[in-house]
């Protein structure tokens, strides 16, 4: 069973083809709009939608040409329907529905977060058994789930204000750095010369619940930098280190609590921030010290991509889900 996946929820235009029977990704194409939006310091929704319109058909032609497949080989077309930028979602959904109608192929709406949650399965060495705890950590979401079976997601905790990735992005703006924030902060943190110069708060780390808060950490960065007399690149690197260390410390601590609370031994990490080297290192240490299994997506599939949508669509399709009509129903916000 072969699925074409379409991702257009924000500023990445992604198409991929996944073979469920072989558990194999056949092809994957991605167009990133980072350079387009960088000069604005963030994603401009109208520009994102227009670029999706310009690129989707081109990527589709390329992916079929390179694989030698045709639409006759496709059993289902999966597309991101929620959450995301409504205009961008509409472009992808309309493209998918149109292809389905023309070629008489079933279509299926996919939740963007479900795509991220399943993305570690794109690693051929990942054989994840249920149940497990999942941390979805990105620019838009920071959430902990207990996953008992496919489609059974119990929310354990989430950010009550900024998402972790959003805090990274806002920190780069406060420090006059570039976009996107996660990469900029991590790279500069690696250049820190005095890792103990700044001590920042760990919001909600010691709270018994599994919720997060990163707004206060962001404010602490702002106040610390405002009061700093020597705003040199060296001190900027030291502050980036302190910020990253605090944010990662909170994420790892909450993951440990979630595993203890649910009595699970398997942990899945996904979303854009899952590419962070320090986060991966600290969670690997946690797993090693306590005998847990931990699963990450391949690095190239941490951020938004069509491969995870094709994968999630395949799992939904074999579980009996598919669109019943041509109605397009996309949502800016939607819980998993």
Swiss-Prot record:
Residues that hold Fe cation according to the record: 112, 116, 304
GO cellular component: cytoplasm
Cofactor note: Binds 1 Fe(2+) ion per subunit.
UniProt cofactor(s): Fe(2+)
Sorted UniProt keywords: Acyltransferase, Cytoplasm, Iron, Metal-binding, Transferase, tRNA processing
Gene3D superfamilies: 3.30.420.40
Enzyme class at the top of the EC tree: transferase
UniProt xrefs under Pfam families: TsaD
Annotated CDD domains: ASKHA_NBD_TsaD_bac
Binding site for substrate: 136-140, 169, 182, 276
One of the GO biological process terms: tRNA threonylcarbamoyladenosine modification
GO molecular function (one): N(6)-L-threonylcarbamoyladenine synthase activity
InterPro entries: ATPase_NBD, Gcp-like_dom, KAE1/TsaD, TsaD
Lineage top rank: taxon: Bacteria
UniProt family annotation: Belongs to the KAE1 / TsaD family.
Function: Required for the formation of a threonylcarbamoyl group on adenosine at position 37 (t(6)A37) in tRNAs that read codons beginning with adenine. Is involved in the transfer of the threonylcarbamoyl moiety of threonylcarbamoyl-AMP (TC-AMP) to the N6 group of A37, together with TsaE and TsaB. TsaD likely plays a direct catalytic role in this reaction.
Protein name: tRNA N6-adenosine threonylcarbamoyltransferase
